[in-house]
Every structure is written in structure tokens, then in C-alpha cells.
Amino acid sequence: MKSGYVSIVGRPNVGKSTLLNCILETHLAITSNKAGTTRNIIEGIYEDSDSQIIFVDTPGIHKPINKLGNILNKKAYSTSENVDLILFLVDIEAGIGKGDMFVLEKLKEENLPIILVLNKVDRVNKDKLLELIMKYKDLYDFSEIFPISALKNDNVNALIKTIKKYLPNEGKIFESDMFTNISTNFYISEIIRQKVLRKTREEVPHSVTCVVEKRIDNKDKEIIQACIIVDRESIKKIIVGKNASMLKSIGMQARIDLEEYFGKKVYLELFVKVIENWREKEKYLKELGLDDLEN
């Protein structure tokens, strides 16, 4: 059986988490239309009759402006240390940008096969597609170049088939009933954070995180208390909304997803706390599990 690790790498907001969710046919990694949604390394396990592939979804590589940004970059870079193959994902609709070039220069340092994955192919015509393929060929000798649409599941199965060619014959790495490395509390916090980002759109930047403070697993109901952390009072007011209307809406949308995940009723209580400059404070980054690659 073919098995191995595959890292999904790219600048922020090119569809890395969407691709992972498409491959696994589940909403494992949260997505939004804002750059930098993914903050932790998420492993999703794909298995079929002749392969087991561990896909590693990474934070988008970017030029950092704070301590959190530095940590996210280090997390993304670290994934190439123990993988068999790198998928370099780009947004073909946006063309070749400085962010893509920044990532590519880092990838050139790796002695690993790299498949260039051109995402959002459904949004460009064939002439632009061919033009960009030629430009990327001039930039680097990629092992393969693959156009896909992760959102529409276009050509993704063919990509999986190609990935298998680069994996060793080592048998299963994990038991068949495993599909991810993330904890339940992490999944809960990410679902809540996704709803914050989607409901508030451009009003709220990525200065938001979420922590599960209490969880009681009853037979017929899951009881969850979670805290949404922001760095400014003005952001808190947006998330809470008039008469707590926005916070109630965020909680309702999160509860729908969580009830589907747990398969039972969920009681979700949300709070919002202001911690100024939390992205620069080691104490809070450690509490949020975001400091493990700082040193």
C-alpha cells in the first residue's frame, strides 16, 4: 500500500483548506474569504483501497508583522521536514503575485518533489491558463503542474492519483478509523472562529481567536462554554452587536455545525473578552497552543 505525508503549501487565501476538505469530503479545516484563516497545522487522513495519504494543511506563508505571524510561518515551514511531497497551491485567477514568489523562493530550498496546483481553474479561460502554466514553468522545474477547482471538486481525483506516484510502499501509517490529528476542543474553537469571520466579514480582522473553557459530554447533550478573544474593545462591540444580536447569530450558526459533528443537541454559551495585543504576548499564545515553534 502506498502511504506518506503530503504538505499543502501556499500564500494565504489560495484555497488550501478548501482543497483538504474536498479531498476528505468533510469540513475538517475552517475556511473563509479572509487571508490567514488557518493557524494550526492540521493533518487529514485520506484512505482508499491502495493508499493512505496524510495531508498537512498549513497556515498561509506571508511576511509577518507580529509574533503570531512569525509563529505561523515557522509552523508552515516546519511541515516540509517530514513529508514526501509538497503541493504548492496558487490562485490562478489572481495570477502570479509577490506572495506566490515569496513562497516559491522558500520551497526552492527543499529537496523534495513539488507539484504546482493551479486552483480556481473554473474562473479563467484556457488562454490565461496556458499563459500562466508557461510562466510558472519558467520559474521552476516542477515535478507536475495540475489545474484544479477545489471548490467544485474538478480534477481533484486525478490529482490524488498523481500524488500516489510519489509515495513509498510502506503500508498504513495510521489505523483506518482515524481521519485527523486535531482534538475535539480545537475543532469546536475553529468552528466558532469561522462563524465570527464569516458573519462579520471585513469589519473584523484576524485579531480574533477562540478558546473552549468548559465542555460537559452528556449522553443526550453536549454543553460547551467558549470565549472569543479580541484585541480591541471596538472589535468586541462588533462581535456582540446590538442587544447581543451578532453574538447570538454566531452561536446559532456554530451550534448547527456542532450538532452535526456530535450527532446530538448542543448547548453553546459564548463570551467575548478583550486582551490587548494578545498576538504579541507569549503567555496568551502559549495558552492558545500557538507558541510551540517560536524558538
Task: Give residue spans per PLM region.
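Catalytic P-loop NTPase motifs of RecA-like helicase/translocase cores
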Residues: 38, 62-63, 95-96, 124-125, ...
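Conserved glycine(s) of the Walker
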Residues: 15, 155, 246
